[in-house]
């Protein structure tokens, strides 16, 4: 077939329009499509002239008037973002030296905060009231936690076998062999370590218990005078002068899911009648060229289908500085001063229009609120693991979120998404400086959300959780290994954040947030050390010959003490602290109605199964988190490349690769304890058998078939599955639609397909002036790329080509005009099938 005829057939035109085009050569086709008759000195630049026509043919409903502009060199450019109005946003250096700060205070250089001056007297009184209440509550929490820990630690001390120093004669230790002395001291050393670790871990569990208990009481009473949601009635008109940007930072995400959720969210906003108060910004940091092209296509389709011209924008950064926080900062610098508020969305976020307008109303009603965090509900996943986790977060999550609000009030958490932020103070106070020094805990901050909340509060602005505001949703990882990959990043980020514990001006609550963030992961190695020391103490106790007579002519032996009744009481108390929040959660559901959870029997059975599941997974997470903490401290780079999975299930090979060492540890541990003391194995059984079963649990729980089966049985049912809100129904509907027209191998199609090449060329960001040096570099890039097979063209080189409109035009022209010369590319493209629904044809 004539390659020119084949090219014309690829254009989304009617047969009559195709017949009108010249079929002599590719240059003639582009010249005919070039309505402005650009004079090009090079044949391979002629596709630049036809970009406008090819775009209008493929996406006529996506292009607003004036959206196709000319750059400084007269090339067609698709204006995907509004005109920038820059603001200055720069970080203050971190001051972590408390001695230097104390010296400044002695010299009178500390400046008292003056943020209350921007509030009216009534607002100042309200602010002071909740701050006083919050302080009293936190001291109460501290007292309850410490008192409980002291009592439990004392009980723990009484049940350990070696009481006091009665089994050691200090006078004999100086005259005997060093090894003998060490073996006499070893049980006491191990017991001291056990007691210390027990105290820390019990304190951590106790804090969670009291948080859940207060949350239970708040939700049971249903009345909270300090809830920020109570500050509005919910139907106030939005101030047209205060506009809101919905920003979604994305990086190599599932394009179909991202744009399905975003479309459902935007249509929900339009249904409220308040769409004029909002704009949407898709801020891409994607570096996979195929995904970059797919994002551009999905953006064009979204604009056409929701009539979002002039309100839905897309930008891909070429320089990915500071990851997600840098992406948000970049938005604030360029467009932030055009908006009063911004709502940060994750790639899997879905929010109703009522929730978004409600957040704006809360900002309007609370002029000293800097961040208001909604409480996102997990939904939308089908694997057994994800459904179990969805159920757990839906049932237990509200207690802990309400409890956090009870203790923290306006000095609360920010989780980085599904939250509204006041833009101006964010620009002024929340830029993040890199952490000084070298090593794994220096450089750009990874977990930016906690730090931004701390900086916002340091500047005097409130950070609230609207825990009772409905309509906010997110998705969870589909399987255990995907969750652990996410935990690895969060672990490193929280360990880095702890360096800010002593930074100047941080509120004590946010210092505690940094501490709890560290403990979320540091508790794993502490628990592992506790188990290891307990095992070592049992080994010493079993293998060491006891010395009952320590003094000459001693009449009565000194026995090691063991009080099993106290051990059982302490164990029962610890289990109550761990599992009572789960019981309170189910009681709350029983009281308020369990129909949406499958009914009384099914929700109760689901709870019991979830408890069993959490017991099986806790030791597995413990070992993984221990590895994450140790690797972070040692500066190890943990590379975790998982294979592609069609249904998000974990292959057996990967499961044994990731869990094999845990399984081996469990087998050795169980065998050793069975040989040493079968009674001690009974206490360790939940730990060792969970490790032995870890590969099997990981694989089985990752399967959608198991999850869908429990869904049919109405187990792990959540309200969003029983009666799905419209925004989630729409998300699923649009996801099916997007999957049916998805674009794979986007970069290759951007080189060959006329429509996708026009889109990539028009959205390319490297808009340089004419330069002989650049021309030489472009020719070199194009020649090097075409002289290799597409498979050998790495990601970075593809990105360089994709970012330059001229290189994309020249690649496009050459592969079509000289297919014999570039046969490796043409043959490769012939093996790739373009989804016929990926682009509309006339």
From Swiss-Prot:
EC number: 2.4.1.-
Enzyme class label: transferase
GO CC term (a single one): plasma membrane
Keywords: Cell inner membrane, Cell membrane, Glycosyltransferase, Membrane, Transferase, Transmembrane, Transmembrane helix
One Pfam match: Glycos_transf_2
Protein name: Glucans biosynthesis glucosyltransferase H
HAMAP family named in the record: MdoH_OpgH
Molecular functions (GO terms): hexosyltransferase activity
Pathway: Glycan metabolism; osmoregulated periplasmic glucan (OPG) biosynthesis
Membrane spanning stretches: 141-161, 194-214, 513-533, 570-590, 615-635, 680-700
Membrane topology: Multi-pass membrane protein
Family membership noted in the UniProt record: Belongs to the glycosyltransferase 2 family. OpgH subfamily.
Keyword presence, Nucleus: no
Role, per record: Involved in the biosynthesis of osmoregulated periplasmic glucans (OPGs).
Source species of the chain: Enterobacter sp. (strain 638)
Compartments where located: Cell inner membrane
GO aspect biological process, one term: glucan biosynthetic process
């Amino acid at each position: 077939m004539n390659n020119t005829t084949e090219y014309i057939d690829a254009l989304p035109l009617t047969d009559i329009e195709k017949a009108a085009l010249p079929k002599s050569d590719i240059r003639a086709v582009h010249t005919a499509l070039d309505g402005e008759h650009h004079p090009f000195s090079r044949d391979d630049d002629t596709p630049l002239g036809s970009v406008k026509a090819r775009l209008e043919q493929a996406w006529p409903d996506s292009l607003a008037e004036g959206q196709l502009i000319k750059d400084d060199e007269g090339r067609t450019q698709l204006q995907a973002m509004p005109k920038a109005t820059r603001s200055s946003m720069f970080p203050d250096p971190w001051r972590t030296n408390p001695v230097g700060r104390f010296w400044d205070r002695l010299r009178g250089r500390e400046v008292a905060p003056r943020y209350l001056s921007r509030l009216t007297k009534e607002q100042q009184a309200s602010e002071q009231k909740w701050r006083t209440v919050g302080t009293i509550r936190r001291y109460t929490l501290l007292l309850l936690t410490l008192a409980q820990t002291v009592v439990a630690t004392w009980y723990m001390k009484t049940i350990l076998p070696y009481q006091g120093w009665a089994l050691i004669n200090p006078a004999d230790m100086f005259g005997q062999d060093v090894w003998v002395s060490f073996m006499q001291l070893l049980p006491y050393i191990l017991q001291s370590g056990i007691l210390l670790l027990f105290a820390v871990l019990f304190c951590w569990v106790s804090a969670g218990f009291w948080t859940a208990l207060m949350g239970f009481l708040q939700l049971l009473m249903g009345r909270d005078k300090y809830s920020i949601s109570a500050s509005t009635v919910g139907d106030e008109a939005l101030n047209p002068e205060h506009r809101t940007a919905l920003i979604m930072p994305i990086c190599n995400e599932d394009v179909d899911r991202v744009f399905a959720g975003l479309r459902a969210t935007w249509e929900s906003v339009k249904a409220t009648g308040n769409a004029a108060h909002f704009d949407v910004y898709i801020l891409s940091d994607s570096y996979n060229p195929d995904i970059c092209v797919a994002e551009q296509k999905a953006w064009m389709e979204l604009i056409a289908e929701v009539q979002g011209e002039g309100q839905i924008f897309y930008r891909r950064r070429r320089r990915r500085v500071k990851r997600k926080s840098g992406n948000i900062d970049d938005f604030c610098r360029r467009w932030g001063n055009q908006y009063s508020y911004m709502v940060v969305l994750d790639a899997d976020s879905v929010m109703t229009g009522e929730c978004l307008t409600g957040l704006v109303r809360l900002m309007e009603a609370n002029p000293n609120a800097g961040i208001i965090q909604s409480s996102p509900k997990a939904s939308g996943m089908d694997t057994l693991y994800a459904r179990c986790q969805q159920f757990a977060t839906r049932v237990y999550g509200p207690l802990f979120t309400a409890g956090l609000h009870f203790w923290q009030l306006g000095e609360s958490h920010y989780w980085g998404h599904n939250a509204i932020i006041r833009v101006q103070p964010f620009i002024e106070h929340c830029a993040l400086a890199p952490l000084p020094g070298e090593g794994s805990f220096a450089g750009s901050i990874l977990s930016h959300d906690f730090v931004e909340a701390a900086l916002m509060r340091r500047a005097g602005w409130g950070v609230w959780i609207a825990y009772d505001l409905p309509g906010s949703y997110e998705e969870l990882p589909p399987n255990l290994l995907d969750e652990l990959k996410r935990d690895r990043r969060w672990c490193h980020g929280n360990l880095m954040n702890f360096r800010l514990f002593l930074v100047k001006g941080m509120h004590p609550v946010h210092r505690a947030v940094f501490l709890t963030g560290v403990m979320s992961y540091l508790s794993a190695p502490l628990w592992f050390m506790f188990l290891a020391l307990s095992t070592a103490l049992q080994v010493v106790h079993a293998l060491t010959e006891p010395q009952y007579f320590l003094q000459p002519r001693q009449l009565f032996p000194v026995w090691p003490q063991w009080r099993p009744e106290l051990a059982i009481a302490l164990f029962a108390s610890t289990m109550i602290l761990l599992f009572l929040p789960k019981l309170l959660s189910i009681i709350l559901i029983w009281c308020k109605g369990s129909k949406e959870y499958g009914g009384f029997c099914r929700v109760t059975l689901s709870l019991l199964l979830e408890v069993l599941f959490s017991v099986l997974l806790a030791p597995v997470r413990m070992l993984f988190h221990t590895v994450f903490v140790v690797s972070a401290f040692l500066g190890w780079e943990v590379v975790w490349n998982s294979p592609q999975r069609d249904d998000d299930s974990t292959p057996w090979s990967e499961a044994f690769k990731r869990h094999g060492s845990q399984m081996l540890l469990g087998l050795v541990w169980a065998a050793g304890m069975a040989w040493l003391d079968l009674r001690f194995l009974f206490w360790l059984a939940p730990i060792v058998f969970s490790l032995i079963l870890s590969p099997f649990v990981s694989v089985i729980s990752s399967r959608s078939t198991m999850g869908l089966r429990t869904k049919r049985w109405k187990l792990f049912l959540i309200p969003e599955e029983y009666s799905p809100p419209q925004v989630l129904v729409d998300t699923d509907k649009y996801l099916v639609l997007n999957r049916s027209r998805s674009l794979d191998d986007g970069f290759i199609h951007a080189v060959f397909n006329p429509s996708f090449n026009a889109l990539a060329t028009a959205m390319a960001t490297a808009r340089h002036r004419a330069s002989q040096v650049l021309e030489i570099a472009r020719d070199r890039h194009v020649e090097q790329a075409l002289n290799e097979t597409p498979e050998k063209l790495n990601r970075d080189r593809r990105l360089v080509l994709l970012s330059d409109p001229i290189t994309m035009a020249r690649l496009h022209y050459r592969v079509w005009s000289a297919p014999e010369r570039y046969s490796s590319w043409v043959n490769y493209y012939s093996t790739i099938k373009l989804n016929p629904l990926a682009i509309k044809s006339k």
